[in-house]
Amino acid sequence: MKNAVHFGAGNIGRGFIGKLLADANVAVTFADVDAPLVDQLSHKQEYKVKVVGSECQIDTVTHVTAVNSASEEVIDRIVQTDLVTTAVGPNVLDIIAKTIAQGIAKRFAAGNLAPLNIIACENMVRGTTHLKGEVYKHLDASLHAQADELVGFVDSAVDRIVPPAEAANDDPLEVTVESFSEWIVDEQQFKGEVPSIAGMEKTHNLMAFVERKLFTLNTGHCITAYLGCLQGHRTIREAIENPAIRDQVKQAMMESGEVLIRRYGFDREMHQAYIEKILARFANPFLVDEVDRVGRQPIRKLGMNDRLIKPLLGTIEFGTANQHLLKGIAAALKYQNDSDPQAVELQRSLQQVGVKKTLAKYTSLAEDSVEVAKIETLYNQL
């Protein structure tokens, strides 16, 4: 039986990556800082996943355990494991890099020269390549050549909506996920044998799929959230069932889709079907996904390589329509959430320096650009 160490025992870790690994007969050790969660997982060594779509089913995931990600034990697990995966959030990758580096160093010192593959499963472009840079900062330079030879840092694109568990459920380990899932990996970056895991698709053209997901699912999801907030909707489903919001979100995804079609040669009809599938996923009656969860961290989401600005830059590159994307960005600026430090910082900036300077600061768009002027106009109309 193959072994994997998975950083992040949260809903995505358990409901998506951990489940696919366990279903492929891989023994999964979750690593997390949440001590009660680690204790429950290591005690029960199984958990339930409720898969909801046109039909609902409950699967039991077995052969799992957990360790504290700040412990020496997780380093020892990396010494022996076949695979390391993560679902910790982009901001936490830099924190776990040191632990992974210590594990690699100890692995080499112990004489384990079997290939090790590491896959960051995060909502970021080339997240594993970023993680590699951070790991190498903590790895002695004398080990870099050996790591280049034996450790594969495999970029991936992941897609599955996993909302927070409902508090009414008395099983803290159970997680609800949608039936749709997509995990695409860059086949060229593996070292040694490429693992065979049902649900993990291999490709030589990862960026096409990374951007397809970022420009469609992520772009549409956050615009639904930001427009939904402005209309007083609580959940993504409520928001997308508002015809005006649904139309706006669909138009924004068609604008970003035009960039994908021109950049990567996606089939137009197939991409339109992909957009419709995503709209249907947002309306899934079994998923209670709050607009505040999807809209949180607006400063990160307004970054130049993220879900709003990157597709906009593509429309500028190809000279294509972008009015609905611009409106989505304006709606993001309107997002208010006192419990989200980024939302608070964004509102403070808008009050202190205004729309144009705030956009220039956080998005890298030029303050005097046509796009920034249009966003300011739309912002004032919302």
Swiss-Prot record:
Domain of life (superkingdom): Bacteria
Q: Which GO terms describe its molecular function?
A: mannitol-1-phosphate 5-dehydrogenase activity
Keywords, comma-separated and alphabetical: NAD, Oxidoreductase
Single GO cellular component term: cytosol
Q: EC number(s) on record?
A: 1.1.1.17
Annotated NAD(+) binding lies at A4, V5, H6, F7, G8, A9, G10, N11, I12, G13, R14, G15
InterPro entries in the record, alphabetically? 6-PGluconate_DH-like_C_sf, 6PGD_dom2, Mannitol_1_phos_5_DH, Mannitol_DH, Mannitol_DH_C, Mannitol_DH_CS, Mannitol_DH_N, NAD(P)-bd_dom_sf
**Record's Pfam families?**
Mannitol_dh, Mannitol_dh_C
User: What SUPFAM superfamilies does this protein map onto?
Assistant: 6-phosphogluconate dehydrogenase C-terminal domain-like (SSF48179), NAD(P)-binding Rossmann-fold domains (SSF51735)
Q: Which GO terms describe its biological process?
A: mannitol catabolic process
**Does this UniProt record's set of keywords contain Oxidoreductase?**
yes
User: What reaction(s) does this enzyme catalyze?
Assistant: D-mannitol 1-phosphate + NAD(+) = beta-D-fructose 6-phosphate + NADH + H(+)
Family, per entry: Belongs to the mannitol dehydrogenase family.
Name of the featured protein:
Mannitol-1-phosphate 5-dehydrogenase
Source lineage = Bacteria, Pseudomonadati, Pseudomonadota, Gammaproteobacteria, Vibrionales
